[in-house]
Amino acid sequence: MKNVPKIWTVAELTREIGQTLNDNPDFVNCWVSGEISNYKNHRPSGHWYFTLKDEQSSMKGVMFRSRAERVRFTPQDGMKVLVRGSIRIYERDGTIQLYAEEMQPSGVGALYLAFEQLKERLGQEGLFAPERKKAIPRYPRRIGIVTSPTGAAIKDILKVMFRRNPQISWILAPAAVQGELAPKEVAQAIARLNRHSQVDVIIVGRGGGSLEELWAFNTEEVARAIAASGIPVISAVGHETDVTIADMVADLRAPTPSAAAELAVPVWRELKSDLEQLEARLHSTMSSQLQRKRQRLDSLKTIGPLSNPFWRIDQNRQRLDSLSERVEQGMTRFVSDKNGILKLLTAKLDLLSPLAILGRGYSLTYGPKGNVLRKSDDINVGQQVQVRLQQGILTCAVLAKSVDSD
C-alpha cells in the first residue's frame, strides 16, 4: 500500500515554516546587509517599513517604534545598511520578513551619518546663517550656565569668571550632559533661563569626551532650543577640535568651557579702564558744549536783543497798544450794528402791537364774560359791553344790533 502524502492547509504550512525558522538559531539575531528601498515611516505608529535588497533578491523588513527611536540616523532609499534582527514568517501573507532590532549604515558610522543629515537639514532651514546670530553683550551683569553641576566644565568656567571679574553674578541651570536624558535636560535648562529672563548671556557646554559622550550637543532638540533662545548663547563643548551642531547654531562658539568664560566676562581692570575713558570723554564733551553756549551768550549780549534788555518789553508794549485799539474799534462797530438791528425789530413789533392798531382809531369790544366780540351775534340787545380804546375803557349797553349785508 502506497504512503498517502500529507495534505497541508495554507495556514498549517505557514506556521510550520515559521516554527522551523524560529527553531534555527542562524535566523535569530542575525545580521543582514543590503540596500534600503520602499522606506516608509508610518504615522502615527512610528514603525518603519522597508525592503532590503541586493542584486539577486529582496526581503521585506519592519522595525517597530521602540527600536526605531534608538537609530541615530534616518534611513533613505538607496542607502546600504547592516540590519540585525530575526527572520520570521508574516502569517497573513505567508511572506518571509526581517524583524529588525538594530540598523547601522554600511561603510560609515551611524553617528557620523546622523550628524551630516541633521547638519544639512538645519542648514537648509537657515539656522546656521550669520544674520540670525545675536551679538554677545560687552558688559553682562549676570551669566547663565547650562552644564553638569558636578563636571569639570563648571569648575573651569567659574575659575576663569572670578579671575576676570570677582563681582560677576551667575546662575547655574543644571543638566545632564551625556546619556539619553541629556538632550531633553539641556533644552529645558535653556528654555528655563529664557523664561525667567535673569541673565544677559548663556554658556552651554561640557568638557571633552568621545563622540558618543558629546552626542547630546548634536541632537535636534538641543539645536532648536539654542536657536529659539532670545538670550545670546555661547557654546563650549569638548575640546578645541570638537565641533558640534550646537556650535553651529549658537551665537558664538568657544573652543572650551574656559574660553567661553573668557569671551563672556570682561576683565575687571579693563572694565574700570573703559569707565574711566568714558568719564573723560563725557567731561570733555560737556566742557566743549558749555564753552560753545557761553560764546553764544556773549554774542547775543552784543548783537542781539540781550544787548538792550528793555527792547523786547517795548516791542510788546507797542503790540499791546495796537491790539487794544483794534479791540476798541471792533466793540464800537459791534454795538452800533446791534443798535440798528434793535431799532428795526422794535419798529416791526410796533406794527404788530394791538395798541398801535387802537392808535389809528380802532377799538376792542369785550362781552360780559370778557370775550372779544367779533360779530353782532356774539351779544344780545340789553347786555353790557366794554369798549377798549387807545386810552381808556367805555362800559356801554347794547340798544340794537344789525348784520352787515356784505
Curated annotation (Swiss-Prot):
The keyword Hydrolase is assigned to this record: yes
One Pfam entry name: tRNA_anti_2
Location, primary (coarse class): cytoplasm
Compartments, as annotated in UniProt: Cytoplasm
GO biological process: DNA catabolic process
Domain of life: Bacteria
Keyword Cell membrane in record: no
Catalytic reaction list: Exonucleolytic cleavage in either 5'- to 3'- or 3'- to 5'-direction to yield nucleoside 5'-phosphates
Molecular function in Gene Ontology: exodeoxyribonuclease VII activity; nucleic acid binding
Keywords: Cytoplasm, Exonuclease, Hydrolase, Nuclease
GO cellular component: cytoplasm; exodeoxyribonuclease VII complex
Entry's transmembrane regions: none
Residue ranges of coiled coil: none
Top-rank EC class of the record's enzyme: hydrolase
Record EC number: 3.1.11.6
Record InterPro entries: Exonuc_VII_L, Exonuc_VII_lsu_C, OB-fold_nuc-bd_dom
Role: Bidirectionally degrades single-stranded DNA into large acid-insoluble oligonucleotides, which are then degraded further into small acid-soluble oligonucleotides.
Assigned protein family: Belongs to the XseA family.
Subunit record text: Heterooligomer composed of large and small subunits.
PANTHER family: EXODEOXYRIBONUCLEASE 7 LARGE SUBUNIT
This protein's name: Exodeoxyribonuclease 7 large subunit
Organism: Desulfitobacterium hafniense (strain Y51)
